[in-house]
Amino acid sequence: MKKILALLALVPSLVFGAGSNYPLDKAPDLTNDLAALQRGAKLFSNYCLNCHSAESMRYNRLRDIGLTDEQIKENLMFATDNVGDTMNISMDPKDAKKWFGAAPPDLSLIARSRASANGPGADYIYTYLRTYYRDPSKPTGWNNMAFPNVGMPHVLWE
């Protein structure tokens, strides 16, 4: 479970599609850094769970990184969900497809699905988040070296 939560620390926003042979950066191992895992969970809740679900993950598993039910409710849950519920979103997939061209994928198993001969899924996620670049030819104004022609903008850009 700690590995899944560590990956959440690295997944503040993702839309994945076809694979890539882009060389992967080595992701830092944060599996034993509870503060980093808690920050990652907060980033994931604030940035990713607006469009992406994590239906194989329940809010109460955040206890594994030292959060209380009260902290989970106050800082990571923004709907009427219960702490034992799965991490769903209210956006209808049909609306998402209309707005974005495709429904954003569920992120709960994305690290497993992105493991390849190039490296573990955590390395793909880490590389993906770090390789956005401006591309005025794209509808969002952004593209990605690890996932060319990505449909999602660089949501961590500030």
Model-assigned labels for residue ranges:
Residues 27, 110-112, 155:
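Short strand-loop junctions, especially beta-strand C-caps/beta-turns
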Residues 62-110:
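Structured domain cores in non-transmembrane regions
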